[in-house]
A protein has these predicted regions:
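Gly/Gly-Pro- and Ser/Thr-rich, intrinsically disordered tail segments characteristic of DNA damage-repair
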Residues: 1-181
Length: 182
């Protein structure tokens, strides 16, 4: 984004809490069905995060747990109808579910761990600091920043897009978390 001769990059960590929980379990955050929610509360509890593979079923990023339960039931009813009866084993993996429509859609529920999210967010911020000075990084939330990169483009001999790609690639390599930039 350019404003008054300045160039800015906004970076957002994709489904951050859910991505951290997947990475901690050795799972792919882009293909694992997982919600971050306190299941010990009622099903009215709000999910802090939902992975992209569950969002693909029309589940919002801030759904209540009962909405996830109901939507997955609907998806499985449709899969059962198309399979002509019973579904086979359950799976939380979007790739396995896509390859075998007779599998039952399942999902993991991860309890929130704010201390862990802060730790990973700090690691991500330290990646940004390898490229941008702290006074040019404006933190919006635990998973979003806006950076004024105006003074860095000539130094690095890169466009804003190239610099963003380098930083989000470094975030992925360092933490396993997918970031998007604009």
């Amino acid at each position: 984004m350019q404003q008054s001769g300045r160039t800015y990059i906004a970076i957002d960590l994709k489904s951050f809490y859910a991505s951290v929980e997947c990475m901690e379990r050795g799972l792919d955050p882009l293909t694992t069905n997982l919600v971050v929610a306190d299941a010990s509360r009622t099903e009215k509890t709000i999910c802090l995060a939902v992975t992209p593979s569950l969002k693909a079923y029309g589940i919002s990023g801030r759904a209540r747990l009962f909405e996830v339960v109901e939507r997955v039931k609907e998806v499985n009813a449709e899969r059962r109808r198309k399979a002509g009866g019973e579904l086979s084993e359950k799976s939380c993996d979007a790739n396995k579910l896509a390859a075998d429509p007779s599998r039952e859609v399942d999902y993991l529920i991860a309890p929130p761990r704010m201390a862990k999210y802060i730790q990973i967010s700090t690691q991500v911020y330290n990646v940004y600091l390898k490229y941008i000075a702290p006074e040019d990084i404006h933190v919006y939330s635990i998973d979003e920043v806006m950076m004024d990169v105006t003074n860095y483009l000539q130094t690095y001999r890169m466009t804003a897009r190239e610099l963003a790609k380098v930083m989000i690639s470094d975030v992925l390599h360092t933490t396993g978390i997918t970031a998007t930039a604009g």
